Every structure is written in C-alpha cells, then in structure tokens.
C-alpha cells in the first residue's frame, strides 16, 4: 500500500461550498482511477498548533506505487488539479505532498 498525503494552505476566504466541492471532487476519484482504494479529505482539526498554516488535507491509499503513478497522470486527476489551485492561498508553498 502507498499513502499519498497532501496538505493545503487554503485561502482565508474559502467558503463552505468550495470545501464541499473539493471534498466531493477528490472522493469521486475512487472507482475512477485503478488501484485507488480510499480518499479522505478534511480541514485541520489538530489542537497542537503545529500546522504551519496548513488548513486542509487529504490522503489517498493506493494498492502500490504503480497505481499511484497511474493517478499522477490520470485525466480525472488532471481535472481536479485546477480546482485545488483555485482554493489555495496565494503563497509559494501552499501545498505539501509526501508519499509513504
């Protein structure tokens, strides 16, 4: 299994509607991309105060690295990317991606 983790610094004026649309777009990728097993999206709820400005995040569980690689260039993923960019804060490091 491969866990693809994405942290987002969303614009301060992000609306509840935009948040729901983003969640829906991400979760809808399940069943469309081979090997993508699960997508979880949420806003930061940590009480620790160590989020460094990251307000939202999601993770995706893939069967293996090959499935993750398919996702990276998959047309359905490419359709979601512009919406993610639209809700990001206007700063150079508004997104962080790691795979485990």
Go through the PLM ranges and name each one.
Residues 83-100:
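Charge-dense polyanion-binding interfaces
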Residues 1-55, 63-73, 96-100:
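Short S/T/G/P-rich N-terminal loop/turn motif that feeds into the first structured element of a domain
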Residues 27-30, 76-82, 88:
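A common structural junction motif
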């Amino acid at each position: 299994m491969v866990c693809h983790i994405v942290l987002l610094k969303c614009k301060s004026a992000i609306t509840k509607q935009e948040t729901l649309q983003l969640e829906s777009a991400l979760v809808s990728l399940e069943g469309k991309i081979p090997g993508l097993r699960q997508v979880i999206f949420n806003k930061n709820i940590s009480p620790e105060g160590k989020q460094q400005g990251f307000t939202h995040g999601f993770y995706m569980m893939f069967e293996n690295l090959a499935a993750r690689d398919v996702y990276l260039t998959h047309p359905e993923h490419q359709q979601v990317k512009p919406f993610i960019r639209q809700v990001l804060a206007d700063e150079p490091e508004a997104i962080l991606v790691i795979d485990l």
